[in-house]
Curated annotation (Swiss-Prot):
Location (main, coarse): cytoplasm
Organism from which the protein derives: Dichelobacter nodosus (strain VCS1703A)
Originating gene: alaS
Free-text comment on the cofactor: Binds 1 zinc ion per subunit.
Alphabetical list of SMART domains matching this protein: tRNA_SAD
Descriptive protein name: Alanine--tRNA ligase
Protein EC: 6.1.1.7
Length: 873
C-alpha cells in the first residue's frame, strides 16, 4: 500500500474511471438545481437524479465525479457530531462512478476492486464486503470473479422488527421509485483496533470501516410496495474521499489526514491554541470548508432556509473559537488556508476568496453584536428569575430572535448554578418547525409520469400544430378535459418556453375548433414541458391535434427583459469590477430582477455609468448572435457560465453588443438586435444578504412608462412647492433647514419645561428611609430628554435618586437616576420593582436604568411605590 495525499486520490479516481469510458462531471452546486425536496446536495448521485428516474437524458451513459456534499440541517444532519467523532463532517467530498443503463453488477464490482487493489494498492486481505442477503448474483461475483473467500463476504438481512427491504444493504430513493440492493466494501484496520465485523453486535467500532458503497438500482417500487424489475438497471456508487484518505495515510481519524492537519494548524494559530488535539479545532476546520463552499455556491448567512443553516455553522465555529479563548475576529482568516489546500481542485474558491473572506468577517462582527445584545436580554431575565431554571421562553427568544446559541446560554447558566427548561424550549422549537413545514418550505413538487419528451420549438416558432400526449387533472392522468377544468397538458411539440434560467414560463392558448385551453404557466420536467392552465371552452382529449400559440406580446416583453440582463451583467462588471458575478435573476414581462456579488450599495454615479453602458449598446443596434458549441470551447472563448445552472456537453452561447460586449451561456429567449430593447432603466436596488446586491430594471415600453410616471410625480412635487422643477430642490433644502431649526427650538423648550424650576418641583423632594428622593411625572418627552432631565434634577437638588414617569399616549416609561454617592442603591433593582405597575420590564446600569410598559394607568402608582423599592439607609 502506498501513501497518497487527498488531492492525489481524487485525481487518481477520476482518471481511472475516465480511462474506463466514464465522463468526468465537475462537482455540481451544493444548492440542488430543480429539486425543492433537498436543502443541500448531500450525496454524489443527487446531480444525476433525473437521469436515474428517466426524466432527463444526456449524451453519456457512464459518469464519474468528486461531488461536494453538505449534511447539516434537514433529514441528513451531522452538525452536532462534528468534531467529536472520527468521521462526521458537515462538508465532505463523495467520489462516485455511475451507470445509467449501461453496465451493471458484473462490471461495477470489478471496477471498484481493481481501483482499490491496483491503483491504490490496498492489500486484498485487508478488504471484506457485505451484500444484501437475497442478492446471490453479487455474492457469486465477489466469490467467483473477484476471488474473495466466503468468510469475507457477509450477507446482511433486513433490520430486526422492520419491514422487508429495510436493510443497511438495500437502498431506496424514497418510498416509491428506483431502489435496489447494495454491496459495501470495508477496510480492516487490524485486530489491535476495537470493533466487530459488519452485522455483528460490535460493528460500530473503528476496526472495520466502510469505504465504498455500490448501489444496484434494479427495481421500481410502486405505491403498493410491489417491486418491478427496471428495464435498464443502473449503478450508483459512493466513496467518501476523507475516509479513503485516512486509510491511505495510515490514520484512524479523518481529522488526521493531510488536508485537515493543515486546516487544524491554521485554526490553532488563528485562535492562539497550542493544543491541536482540541475538539473545537476540528469543529472550526470542518466548518470553514462548509462555509466557504456554501458561499461560493451563492448561499449567504440569513435567518431562513439554507442561509440559516450556514449562519448556524459559522456561529458554531466562532463559538468554539471563543471557547478556546479567542475573543477577536479569526474565522475569516482561515479562508486563505482552505484555498491553499483545495484551490487547485476547485478554482472557483480562488476567484471568490476576497468576497467570501469579507462576508465571513462581517458575519463575525454581527455575531459579536448578537452576543452583546443577547447578554443584555439574558441579564435582565436573570435579574427577575425566581428559582434556578431559565424558562424555555427565554432560551427560545434568545436563540430565535437574537441568534444566541443555546449551548452558550447553557454555559452561562451552568456557571451560575442554573439549568435550562429544555422541554419548554424544545416544545417551542417543535412548534416553529411545524409552522415552517406548513408554510411549504422546501416542499416536494409533483412529478407527472410521462413517457417520451416534448420537442422544444420556442427558439424557432411562436405557434405550431401539436398533439396532446397527456392530460392531468388534480395531478391524476385523464383522457378528456371538460370546460372549466384546471389541468396540465403535455404536447408532442411546443413553442412555449418552460421556466428556467430565471426566465418565467410562457402563457398563451392551446386550441382547436371544439375547445380552447388558456395556458397560464409553463414548467419543465426534465425533457417534458408541462402547460398549466384552464379549459375556457369546449372539450379537449388525449390524441387531439391542436394549435399551440404563445402570448406574443408577453413573450416580447420577457425577451427584452431577459436580453437586458446580459447587458446589465457586463455593465456592472465594467463599472464595479470583475468580482461581480450573477447570483440569481427573475425575468418577467414587467421587469427584471438581478442579484450579484457586491458589498456596497451603488452610488448615483455608478448607476448612471451602468445605464450609460447598456443604452450605448442599445443605440448601436447590433445583431444578437446565438450559436451552439462544446462547453469547453465556449468557456475558452470567455463565455460566462451562470450560477445555479446545469450545462451539458453542447451549450448555447449568446453574444450581444458591439465587439462581443457580453458573451454568456444561456438557454433563454432573446431579441434579434440590441436596439429592440428600446431603453433600459434601473428603478431600484437593495441588499439581499451580506455581499449580495439586487437591482431591478425595466426595458422597452415598461421603461417608457416608468419615466413618464417619474415625470408626473416631479410635476406634482413642484406644484405642491409652488415652484418650477428647476428650483424645486433648492426650495426643499430650505424647508428642511427651517424644520431642523424649529425642531431644535421645540427640544430646548421641552427641556426647560421638564426641569421646571417652579415651587412644585422643589416640593417634590421627599426623604424616604433616609434617602433624598424625587418622583415626578413628565409626559410627551423622548428618551434623551428624560435621561438628561433625570440627571439634571438629581444634580440640581443633590438627590440620592430621581424617578421620572412619562407617557406618550401609547406607552408608559420610567427612568431612574442614582447618585454615585448612593452606592447602596441600584437603579436596575429599583426600576424592576416599579415596572411591575406598568406591566413592563426594564434594566440598566447601577446608576441609571429605564423600563417600558403598556399600562399607562399604572404610571402614577409606580411613582407612588418608590418607598417599596428603597432599602433603609
Amino acid at each position: 500500500m502506498k501513501t497518497m495525499t487527498t488531492a492525489e486520490i481524487r485525481r487518481a479516481f477520476l482518471n481511472y474511471f475516465s480511462e474506463n469510458g466514464h465522463k468526468i462531471v465537475h462537482s455540481a452546486s451544493l444548492v440542488p438545481g430543480n429539486d425543492p425536496t433537498l436543502l443541500f446536495t448531500n450525496a454524489g448521485m443527487v446531480p444525476f437524479k433525473e437521469l436515474f428516474i428517466g426524466t432527463e437524458t444526456r449524451d453519456y451513459r457512464r459518469a464519474t465525479s468528486a461531488q461536494r456534499c453538505v449534511r447539516a440541517g434537514g433529514k441528513h444532519n451531522d452538525l452536532e457530531n462534528v468534531g467529536y467523532t472520527a468521521r462526521h463532517h458537515t462538508f465532505f467530498e463523495m467520489l462516485g462512478n455511475f451507470s445509467f443503463g449501461d453496465y451493471f453488477k458484473a462490471e461495477a464490482i470489478p471496477f471498484a476492486w481493481r481501483f482499490l487493489t491496483e491503483v491504490l494498492q490496498l492489500p486484498a486481505e485487508k478488504l471484506l464486503v457485505t451484500v444484501y442477503h437475497e442478492d446471490d448474483e453479487a455474492y457469486r461475483i465477489w466469490q467467483e470473479k473477484i476471488g474473495l473467500p466466503a468468510d469475507r463476504i457477509i450477507r446482511i438481512g433486513d433490520k430486526a422488527g422492520k419491514a422487508k427491504y429495510e436493510s443497511d444493504n438495500f437502498w431506496a430513493m424514497g418510498d416509491t421509485g428506483p431502489c435496489g440492493p447494495c454491496t459495501e466494501i470495508f477496510y480492516d484496520h487490524g485486530a489491535e483496533i476495537f470493533g466487530g465485523r459488519p452485522g455483528s453486535a460490535d460493528e460500530d467500532g473503528d476496526r472495520f470501516i466502510e469505504i465504498w458503497n455500490i448501489v444496484f438500482m434494479q427495481f421500481e417500487r410502486d405505491a403498493e410496495g410491489t417491486m418491478k424489475p427496471l428495464p435498464k438497471p443502473s449503478i450508483d456508487t459512493g466513496m467518501g474521499l476523507e475516509r479513503i484518505a485516512a486509510v491511505m495515510q495510515g490514520v484512524h481519524s479523518n481529522y488526521d489526514i493531510d488536508l485537515f492537519i493543515h486546516l487544524i494548524d491554521a485554526a490553532a494559530k488563528a485562535v492562539g491554541c497550542k493544543n491541536e488535539g482540541q475538539a473545537s479545532l476540528k469543529v472550526i476546520a470542518d466548518h470553514i470548508r462548509a462555509t466557504v463552499f456554501l458561499m461560493v455556491d451563492g448561499v449567504l448567512p440569513s435567518n431562513e432556509g439554507r442561509g440559516y443553516v450556514l449562519r448556524r455553522i459559522m456561529r458554531r465555529a466562532i463559538r468554539h473559537g471563543y471557547k478556546l479563548g479567542q475573543q477577536g475576529l479569526f474565522f475569516h482568516k482561515l479562508v486563505a488556508a482552505l484555498v491553499a489546500e483545495m484551490g487547485e481542485a476547485y478554482p472557483e474558491i480562488i476567484a471568490e476568496q476576497a468576497r467570501i473572506t469579507e462576508t465571513i468577517r462581517k458575519e463575525e462582527l454581527r455575531f459579536a453584536q448578537t452576543l452583546t445584545a443577547g447578554m443584555q436580554i439574558l441579564e435582565q431575565d436573570l435579574a427577575t428569575l425566581k428559582g434556578t431554571i431559565i424558562s424555555g421562553e427565554t432560551v427560545f427568544k434568545l436563540y430565535d430572535t437574537y441568534g444566541f446559541p443555546v449551548d452558550l446560554t447553557n454555559d452561562i447558566a451552568r456557571e451560575r448554578g442554573l439549568t435550562l427548561d429544555e422541554a419548554g424550549y424544545e416544545a417551542l422549537m417543535q412548534a416553529q418547525r411545524e409552522r415552517a413545514k406548513a408554510s411549504g418550505t422546501f416542499r416536494a413538487d409533483k412529478t407527472y409520469t410521462v413517457s417520451g419528451k416534448t420537442a422544444f420549438l420556442a427558439y424557432q416558432q411562436e405557434q405550431t400544430e401539436s398533439t396532446i400526449e397527456a392530460i392531468f387533472v388534480q395531478e391524476q392522468a385523464a383522457d378528456t378535459l371538460d370546460c372549466g377544468d384546471e389541468a396540465v397538458l403535455v404536447l408532442n411539440q411546443s413553442p412555449f418556453y418552460g421556466e428556467s434560467g430565471g426566465q418565467i414560463g410562457d402563457s398563451g392558448v392551446i386550441y382547436h375548433q371544439n375547445g380552447a385551453f388558456l395556458v397560464s404557466d409553463t414548467q419543465k420536467q426534465g425533457d417534458v414541458l408541462l402547460h398549466f392552465g384552464r379549459l375556457q371552452r369546449g372539450v379537449l382529449s388525449v390524441g387531439d391535434t391542436v394549435c399551440a400559440e404563445i402570448d406574443r406580446a408577453r413573450r416580447a416583453a420577457i425577451r427584452r427583459h431577459h436580453s437586458a440582463t446580459h447587458l446589465l451583467h457586463q455593465a456592472l462588471r465594467m463599472t464595479l469590477g470583475t468580482h461581480v458575478q450573477q447570483k440569481g435573476s427573475l425575468v418577467d414581462a414587467d421587469k427584471l430582477r438581478f442579484d450579484f456579488s457586491h458589498d456596497a450599495a451603488l452610488t448615483a454615479a455608478e448607476i448612471g455609468a451602468v445605464e450609460q453602458l447598456i443604452n450605448e449598446q442599445i443605440l448601436r443596434n447590433q445583431p444578437v448572435n446565438i450559436s451552439e458549441m462544446p462547453y469547453d470551447q465556449a468557456c475558452a472563448q470567455g463565455a460566462m457560465a451562470l450560477f445555479g445552472e446545469k450545462y451539458g456537453d453542447i451549450v448555447r452561447v449568446v453574444k450581444m453588443g458591439a465587439d462581443d460586449f457580453s458573451v454568456e451561456l444561456c438557454g433563454g429567449t432573446h431579441v434579434k438586435q440590441t436596439g429592440d430593447l428600446g431603453l433600459v432603466k434601473i428603478i431600484a436596488q437593495s441588499a439581499v444578504a451580506a455581499g449580495i446586491r439586487r437591482v431591478e430594471c425595466v426595458a422597452g415600453l415598461a421603461a417608457l412608462r416608468y419615466c413618464q410616471q417619474q415625470e408626473t410625480q416631479l410635476q406634482r412635487i413642484a406644484a405642491v412647492l409652488k415652484s418650477d422643477l428647476e428650483h424645486s430642490v433648492e426650495k426643499i433644502e430650505r424647508l428642511q433647514q427651517d424644520t431642523k431649526t424649529l425642531e431644535k427650538t421645540v427640544q430646548q423648550l421641552k427641556r426647560t419645561v421638564a426641569l421646571g424650576g417652579t415651587q412644585e418641583t422643589a416640593e417634590s423632594v421627599v426623604d424616604i428611609h433616609g434617602w433624598k428622593t424625587m418622583a415626578v411625572r413628565r409626559d410627551d418627552l423622548d428618551n434623551a430628554i428624560l435621561r438628561d432631565t433625570a440627571d439634571q434634577l438629581r444634580d440640581k437638588y443633590q438627590l440620592d435618586v430621581v424617578v421620572i414617569g412619562s407617557s406618550d399616549g401609547e406607552m408608559a416609561r420610567l427612568v431612574v437616576s442614582v447618585a454615585k454617592s448612593a452606592a447602596a442603591l441600584k437603579a436596575g433593582a429599583i426600576v424592576q420593582t416599579l415596572a411591575a405597575f406598568i406591566d413592563g420590564k426594564g434594566g440598566g446600569r447601577p446608576d441609571f436604568a429605564q423600563a417600558g410598559g403598556k399600562n399607562i394607568q399604572g404610571l402614577d402608582a409606580a411613582l407612588a411605590a418608590l418607598p417599596q423599592a428603597l432599602p433603609q439607609k
